[in-house]
């Protein structure tokens, strides 16, 4: 049993075979996936909700949960009307997280100061909605300062004063940092999610982190359609391939892939306060 804790299946790359992709996931033991609600910007941040409304609850597909939020790429598009709309979407019964949000200094599609301001606002909205946050953090090639900035903002505006005391917490998705970054995130109460890039030859720092992170603080994901793992690298990614992430982590820790899948599945349901047997959310305080 596996859960893909982060995927984007709403895009055009799946228009011709989306149902088949979901069916393949279920056939490969994927119990559920989290449909990330970023879309092409604030106006389409309900894309995960629309996926859940169309496909969730059908026995041939995985269960589908959703998030809402503004990706740092689209930070320049944020406005008060969008914030209000996302708070409305956050009330949907399938929405369990706010994200992905954070900082991206690699592409810099939005100015960095704008990214920081919107990241702060998104954390405020997540607190209002009482939802955990899903963090996107990508540094530039020649600097790790995105990690320092991102973790500092989490300390100041989320975990220290709000997240740890309220129990909201968060997930560092598609982790690409160092062992030290992972330790700092764990100290802040975050889960660490590993994606297909853990299988890439040059990703030793990610593999080192995966050996250090306690199994009960770990999630796995595909980040589909991106970062297809070896042996599928270069292809369009899909949730069925999350088993390759589990296999790689299992090899690092001398455990069967199935155990990594089972443990991270339980972690997903525990973190979000969901009942595994019924896949219905428990009441939030």
Predicted feature residues:
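Mid-domain alpha/beta scaffold segments of enzyme catalytic cores
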Residues: 1-285
């Amino acid at each position: 049993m596996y859960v893909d804790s982060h995927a984007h299946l709403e895009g055009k790359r799946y228009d011709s075979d989306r149902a088949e992709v979901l069916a393949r996931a279920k056939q490969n033991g994927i119990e559920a996936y989290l449909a990330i609600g970023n879309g092409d910007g604030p106006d389409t941040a309900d894309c995960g909700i629309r996926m859940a409304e169309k496909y969730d609850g059908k026995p041939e597909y995985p269960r589908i949960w959703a998030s809402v939020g503004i990706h740092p790429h689209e930070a320049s598009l944020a406005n008060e009307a969008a914030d209000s709309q996302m708070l409305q979407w956050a009330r949907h019964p399938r929405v369990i997280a706010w994200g992905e949000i954070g900082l991206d200094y690699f592409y810099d599609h939005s100015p960095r100061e704008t990214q920081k301001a919107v990241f702060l606002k998104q954390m405020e909205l997540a607190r209002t909605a009482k939802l955990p946050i899903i963090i996107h953090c990508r540094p530039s090639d020649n600097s790790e300062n995105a990690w320092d900035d991102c973790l500092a903002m989490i300390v100041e505006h989320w975990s220290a004063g709000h997240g740890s005391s309220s129990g909201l917490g968060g997930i560092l998705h598609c982790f690409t940092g160092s062992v030290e970054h992972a330790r700092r995130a764990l100290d802040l109460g975050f889960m660490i999610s590993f994606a297909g890039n853990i299988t890439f030859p040059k990703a030793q720092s990610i593999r080192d982190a995966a050996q250090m992170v306690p199994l009960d603080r770990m999630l796995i994901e595909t980040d589909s359609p991106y970062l297809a793992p070896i042996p599928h690298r270069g292809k369009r990614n899909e949730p069925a391939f999350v088993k390759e992430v589990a296999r790689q982590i299992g090899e690092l820790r001398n455990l069967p892939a199935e155990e990594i899948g089972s443990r991270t599945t339980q972690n997903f349901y525990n973190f979000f306060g969901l009942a595994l047997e019924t896949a219905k959310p428990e009441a939030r305080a």
